[in-house]
Regions:
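Active-site/pore-lining binding-face segments in mid-to-C-terminal subdomains
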Residues: 266, 277-397
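Residues in short coils/turns that link rungs of repeat/solenoid architectures in beta-rich domains
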Residues: 148, 181, 219, 252-253, ...
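Bacterial N-terminal signal peptides
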Residues: 26-37
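C-terminal functional modules
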Residues: 341, 347-460
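Acidic Gly/Asp/Thr-rich repetitive segments characteristic of extracellular carbohydrate-active
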Residues: 46-91
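Short, T/G/N/S-enriched strand-turn elements that build extracellular solenoid repeat scaffolds
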Residues: 57, 77-84, 101-110, 129-133, ...
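Right-handed parallel beta-helix
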Residues: 100-245
């Protein structure tokens, strides 16, 4: 593929005008309405194509440029050191390769930061044997791969690691990243269930205004090192998290939580491709034992233009959205596709518990981010496979394998990274960072050749 096309994939929202034009004639009048009301021009986006309630976060805009100059787990010049600095900052990379965290989670606690993985020389940056907790506000992270894996821990031990989790964070966008081989969730939004005395205070006290866009969220490890053993999970959106947008992601080979909303969550799920879930794709569950005597809150979910396709690990029967627990869910679903391995339709709604919970279908979205452009569901599979994940212009072998298996209906849920080749071991590469090559306000490249690639034309 020419680099000019690769650059357009990177800097633009592929749904764009094409989605608006096609929805103008679509029979789904409700979907057409969802594409209206663009953001005011006065609010600059974090980067072109940014979406969701975190779309206008400044991240590290205007702050100091911090260069990652080595692949060490910590110390001067490391990624961890850059993330622990105070004040607005843009983290760029003068090295490419693997950072071995040695089971020491990175905890990002200082706000106003942009992590620009697109600046790294090929093959980009991959974190292994650990993950990242984002416990700050106004964070943009793009084009990073995180693969925790078993990290040498014993089966059923205490090694339950998310690739990325937000912890009471807000105004956070995780965009075009690859998150695989977690032993807990691959990508989650979390925090305390109840902070304060009212539902509004609960929501402000946990993660809110979070966007997960254009990521590969795949191969959560099953019978692995988590103390509960089976724990192949995609995304957990924890109780009372709100203003959550999950957009344009690939969920592949995760047993459950593709994604899962817990009690009282308010979020939007649009144009995602869910392939080969084990026993659940989307699900909602308010667990009465966790809420105790606290009044249950209705969850709110809007799901539009998503695709679910069963694979070799899928347990049938399976529904697109499954309900468990005891809390009710306000649900708006339109133009979603759910099929088995030979293209036969699967049910849209189901349940996996006998509690009193209800799915209350609504005529209008209970929650929506105005300005979101929606692609028709029958175009989503190709679009997601082309655009999701870190560095689409410079795929690494593991991403290529996941994408190819998804396209061809292959692959499975795995228990260890060793089943698919183990941790990557590329040689370290170097390239000086030149600020004149980048629009520093958005960390977009000024020219196609700025995006370093040794894989152009290799395809998937």
């Amino acid at each position: 593929m020419p680099k000019e096309q690769l650059l357009m994939m990177f800097v633009s929202n592929p749904a764009g005008a094409r989605a608006r034009r096609r929805h103008r004639y679509a029979p789904l009048a409700a979907v057409l309405l969802l594409t209206a009301h663009p953001l005011p021009a006065a609010e600059p986006l974090a980067f072109p194509g940014a979406v969701g309630w975190a779309a206008t976060t400044p991240g590290g805009r205007g702050g100091q440029i911090l260069k990652v100059t080595n692949l060490d787990a910590d110390g001067p010049g490391s990624l961890r050191a850059a993330l622990t600095e105070e004040g607005p900052r843009i983290v760029v990379f003068e090295v490419g390769g693997v950072i071995d965290l040695d089971r020491k989670t990175i905890r990002l606690e200082q706000p106003f930061v942009t992590v620009a993985g697109q600046t790294a020389p090929s093959p980009g940056i991959t974190l292994i044997r650990g993950g990242m907790d984002i416990a700050a506000h106004d964070v943009v992270m793009q084009h990073i791969r995180i693969r925790p894996g078993e990290a040498g821990a014993a089966k059923g031990s205490d090694w339950g690691e998310d690739a990325v989790s937000t912890a009471s964070a807000y105004n956070v966008t995780v965009d075009h990243c690859t998150l695989t081989w977690a032993t807990d969730e691959n990508l989650s939004a979390s925090g305390p269930r109840f902070t304060g005395d009212s539902p509004d205070e609960w929501r402000s006290g946990t993660s809110h205004s979070i966007t997960f866009s254009h990521n590969i969220i795949a191969e959560g490890l099953g019978d692995s090192t988590h103390p509960k053993f089976e724990h192949s999970k995609g995304s957990l959106i924890h109780d009372n998290a709100s203003r959550i947008l999950i957009y344009g992601n690939l969920y592949a080979h995760n047993y459950e939580r593709n994604p899962m909303f817990k009690g009282g969550v308010q979020g939007v799920i649009v144009n995602n491709f869910i392939y080969d879930p084990g026993q659940r794709a989307l699900h909602y569950n308010l667990m009465a034992l966790e809420w105790g005597d606290v009044p249950f809150q209705e969850g709110e979910m809007t799901a539009v233009g998503n695709v679910l396709r069963a694979g070799p690990s899928t347990e049938l029967p399976l529904a697109f959205l499954m309900l468990g627990g005891h809390g009710d869910l306000l649900y708006y679903g339109r133009d979603n596709i759910a099929v088995d391995r030979i293209g036969e339709p699967l049910p849209m709604l189901g349940r996996y518990a006998t509690g009193k919970a209800r799915i209350i279908e609504t005529d209008e979205p209970p929650v929506w981010w105005e300005g979101l452009e929606v692609l028709p569901a029958n175009e989503v599979e190709t679009w997601v496979l082309k655009n999701a994940g870190a560095r689409p212009w410079d795929r690494d072998p593991q991403d290529i394998r996941v994408l190819a298996d998804t396209a061809e209906g292959r692959g499975k849920i795995i228990d260890s990274e060793e089943e698919v080749g183990g941790y990557p071991q590329p040689e370290m590469t170097h390239r000086p960072f030149n600020p004149e090559d980048w629009y520093l306000e958005t960390m977009m490249p000024k020219r196609p050749e700025v995006l370093d690639s040794r894989a152009a034309g290799r395809g998937t």
